[in-house]
Swiss-Prot record:
Name of the protein this chain belongs to: Mitosis inhibitor protein kinase SWE1
UniProt source species: Saccharomyces cerevisiae (strain ATCC 204508 / S288c)
Protein location: Bud neck; Nucleus
Lineage of origin: Eukaryota, Fungi, Dikarya, Ascomycota, Saccharomycotina
Bias (Low complexity) ranges: 717-736
Biased composition (Acidic residues): 88-102
Amino acid sequence: MSSLDEDEEDFEMLDTENLQFMGKKMFGKQAGEDESDDFAIGGSTPTNKLKFYPYSNNKLTRSTGTLNLSLSNTALSEANSKFLGKIEEEEEEEEEGKDEESVDSRIKRWSPFHENESVTTPITKRSAEKTNSPISLKQWNQRWFPKNDARTENTSSSSSYSVAKPNQSAFTSSGLVSKMSMDTSLYPAKLRIPETPVKKSPLVEGRDHKHVHLSSSKNASSSLSVSPLNFVEDNNLQEDLLFSDSPSSKALPSIHVPTIDSSPLSEAKYHAHDRHNNQTNILSPTNSLVTNSSPQTLHSNKFKKIKRARNSVILKNRELTNSLQQFKDDLYGTDENFPPPIIISSHHSTRKNPQPYQFRGRYDNDTDEEISTPTRRKSIIGATSQTHRESRPLSLSSAIVTNTTSAETHSISSTDSSPLNSKRRLISSNKLSANPDSHLFEKFTNVHSIGKGQFSTVYQVTFAQTNKKYAIKAIKPNKYNSLKRILLEIKILNEVTNQITMDQEGKEYIIDYISSWKFQNSYYIMTELCENGNLDGFLQEQVIAKKKRLEDWRIWKIIVELSLALRFIHDSCHIVHLDLKPANVMITFEGNLKLGDFGMATHLPLEDKSFENEGDREYIAPEIISDCTYDYKADIFSLGLMIVEIAANVVLPDNGNAWHKLRSGDLSDAGRLSSTDIHSESLFSDITKVDTNDLFDFERDNISGNSNNAGTSTVHNNSNINNPNMNNGNDNNNVNTAATKNRLILHKSSKIPAWVPKFLIDGESLERIVRWMIEPNYERRPTANQILQTEECLYVEMTRNAGAIIQEDDFGPKPKFFI
């Protein structure tokens, strides 16, 4: 065929395609086409050549041509494209003369994309197919793009739903959380050592601890095995704190300490000590030990010498033994009758203007002992010479409240004339002034922290003159704890301690107030020290840590002692506590309870209508929050929640649904308050464990007269508690099981003495009195006196022989009228 004929055929083909295109445009779209096909190019004639058409307004012309370019490039290697090599193709033989229907069906069956991959241009092995047909492209778009769009919409909707979907667990009421199931790490560890920021010297850590507080360890005994406050702290910590704070201590290693043999002054003092033994107020029992030390040992073990000197201050003032009898007179209104301060004359003094003498504790004695002769005489306030001995005893409060301004007339002993001593005292006083609590080291010994609250810090101290331990609460006013509240607390403590009424019963369950003073911007309240810590620490260490519960007898004793304390402050002092919780209930050496921390307390009726004192939300009464109503019965409500916490071993909530349920009188989340297993580890207890719930149910069923049905009902009711796997059906097996269980209960009941009162084994009396105490309407709650007048409390108070936390077997001691 000639070239002319070929050109004519090509022209006819092009003309045919144009006519088809114009025909579509004139007569409308075919069935199944949309508006996007109006400008489709290419018709149905197979072609593999790039063609340009003179339609400038056709937007798909260039894109279709570009598609033709990519389809015609069959030589492109799969390695050059990360998408081309992943397309799956069907390996089929190409048949000649395949019509348009077969191509469309193949496109419908072809899945060239993997999941989660973007759409790419399909590559086939065909070199000339109807791949640029508008119908094929339309079907291609309809098959794949709607699915991808739908997938994108679903993904976006699900992601937005997951973000906006609330946490469903927030609507689930979990109730009260048992302390048994909680990790012990959630509870704060008891403070065993003082929080001292000073780094200890390695020489101090290697010292011998055999002679530390031998006298105090003899008296350190308790009915409890472990007590937070009875823990004997390492006395070296306070010594390190004060000794290391002084910058002059860095120069101490280079100072030569003269021996006793080479010091004329020490020899004179040593012989003078033998001649005037009855004229001195302080005697050092360790002088003989230090005298026998060699110079090398004395110099290398200087830290040990400080320790010996610390224990060497022993007062021989016999008048101090009578100071406790006259303490109240000396503390309130009799200080002005004291004679003028005594001037201690000293012929060794070389100072022209002696500085005022201050009451010095272990700190001054230790530092002076470090660089001076060990046999020198020490002097503290109240220690007089033979010619100036006074017959009036020295009061405890006057020694404590002594300030630097009021002691200007006292003289310093002769050994304080050293320039280095004066420099050390000046530097140390500047450092101590930075922390007001540091002045306690000058007035007391063995000072260490035993607790820290939101507004205060509590220290345990020892008064050197009487060797008696006290607790000092340091409070610094701030915007959350005003000065007015601090002064009110001191006033209330003073009033409660000195309250003289006809009925003094219950006063022994209130913390004893000793003294108070102000130093710089802080206030200090001195009270008696309860060696066994507080009730909260006892519950954590002796109950929760051992995975057990208190028996009902001790719980009733706690109710009795705290009710006695509340009745005294309510009826005799007209004071409401408003912050009753286990952390504010102290435990004495004998195991009795004492109510302390009157920081939220106030007098009733209120004088200030704007008064707003709220304790912890876990124990606060509902009327205080809702109506700002303050009544004595708010303390009764707090006592009731304390018993719920102690008896059920649960953590009281501070908000939420469980919080509101407790304030509506609902105890369903707490479970049974009476212990279902009252067997204890006491030496007087039998090996057999007694389930008081089964015993009470058995007695109740016998009274009903229908032992079989009632026995079956009893087993059914208690199946969740005693035997969760028991079948709850009503067949003969259950009747036999109930009879067997009743016989077992009879065997167990024989282990319970006949004199045991019913309220200790019925499982209902404790819950009944707790519901009475947490009555939502405060007017229906009992008073402290009404609680004490119940039969249960009268029996407990009449028969108990020990403190509230002391175990007295499972059911308490046997009453004397049964003996």
